[in-house]
Amino acid sequence: MSAIAGIVLAGGRSSRFGSDKLTALYDGIPLLHHAIAHVAAVSDDVIVVMSPSAEGEGLPAGARLVHDSSEGEGPLAGLHVGLLSAVRSDVALVVAGDMPDVSVDVLRELLLFLEGGQSDAVALGTELGPSPVPIVLRTWPAADAVHTLLHAGRRRLGDVLDVLDTVVIDETTWTAMDPGRRSLFDVDEPSDLER
């Protein structure tokens, strides 16, 4: 298998949460640490993309902090920074820092679909279409595509799936490994920490 970079997007403002949600405790551990641990289980390098003001204090050993200096430009800009930081990896596995329950089995399945095919991206299918995270990308085609999208004024993370050759794993396939669909659960408000 190719070298894999795990990119954890953690640059959001937590506006609905009311404080820095990534440091909030979920099952007794900071929320961000859950996402990092799941990504670390299946990748060779873990890159945590945070805002310029973030110091990254207390990040788990082995997690590498990179700053997204384009603050306010959206998650696609953070993805671009992460991809450019993954220069030694052919494959990038992308999750959001507020996704504490993403299944390692589902992440492995995403990687297997990419490794076994010719596509440049693999996403999980949902009733609303492909989920923008977690996703797996071929690093350089994705970096080029994201660069083009940003220059065209596009900012949504899911936009990259629109322009890359993307395979979408059928919902019945991936939910067999994650029947509760926890791989798509993200924390937006304090009450979400209780779910």
Where are these regions (language model features)?
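Glycine-rich phosphate/pyrophosphate-binding loop and the adjoining helix
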Residues: W174-R195
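Nucleotide and nucleotide-moiety/phosphate-recognizing core
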Residues: M1-R181
